[in-house]
From Swiss-Prot:
InterPro entries: CNPY (IPR042415), DUF3456 (IPR021852), SaposinB_dom (IPR008139). Disulfide bonds join 28-171, 31-164, 86-137. The modification Phosphoserine is found at residue 115. A motif (Prevents secretion from ER) lies at residues 179-182. Residues 1-20 form the signal peptide. This is Protein canopy homolog 2. Belongs to the canopy family. The keyword Endoplasmic reticulum applies.
Length: 182
């Protein structure tokens, strides 16, 4: 009877470890996809487009303390993007990395809407995957909204690694793999 207890304990530990790995792969993949989508949307904005920021109160001398800032990285634009970005997770599929056996999430619909130019070999595409990825994305946006706005309000190199691995700990490994833009 003692042997069964140890077997049950071992099975519980193994299942818990597998679930934790799956959850971490999911949240890491959602973070990486979120960063890709935000970088894409920011790059699409005309760099000359600005927005007025500051106080709209009139000072005693009749002037206002208003500053023009680039719209692409403004808090207003980033907040707007964060409200919609997770809807794009339906454009991602799941792929198992053959060398690490970890799940990656890759775009399965190109940015121009055509899928004929994509290699979809070995990628699972279904509503369960996109649904769980969207939920993970929404959880990340809710929990790390301030960090996301802070990171994207200024240009930075290697945002995926800095945000997803170092700042939020959603990825347990540095993200040195390429993630081609479509």
């Amino acid at each position: 009877m003692k042997g069964w207890g140890w077997l049950a304990l071992l099975l519980g530990v193994l299942l818990g470890t597998a679930w934790a790995r799956r959850s971490q792969d999911l949240h890491c993949g959602a973070c990486r996809a979120l960063v890709d989508e935000l970088e894409w949307e920011i790059a699409r904005v005309d760099p000359k487009k600005t927005i007025q920021m500051g106080s709209f109160r009139i000072n005693p001398d009749g002037s206002q303390s208003v500053v023009e800032v680039p719209y692409a990285r403004s808090e207003a634009h980033l907040t707007e993007l964060l409200e919609e970005v997770c809807d794009r997770m339906k454009e991602y599929g799941e792929q198992i990395d053959p060398s690490t056996h970890r799940k990656n999430y890759v775009r399965v619909v190109s940015r121009n809407g055509e899928s004929s130019e994509l290699d979809l070999q070995g990628i699972r595409i279904d509503s369960d995957i996109s649904g769980t990825l969207k939920f993970a994305c929404e959880s990340i946006v809710e929990e790390y909204e301030d960090e996301l706005i802070e990171f994207f309000s200024r240009e930075a190199d290697n945002v995926k690694d800095k945000l997803c691995s170092k700042r939020t700990d959603l990825c347990d490994h540095a993200l040195h793999r390429s993630h081609d833009e479509l």
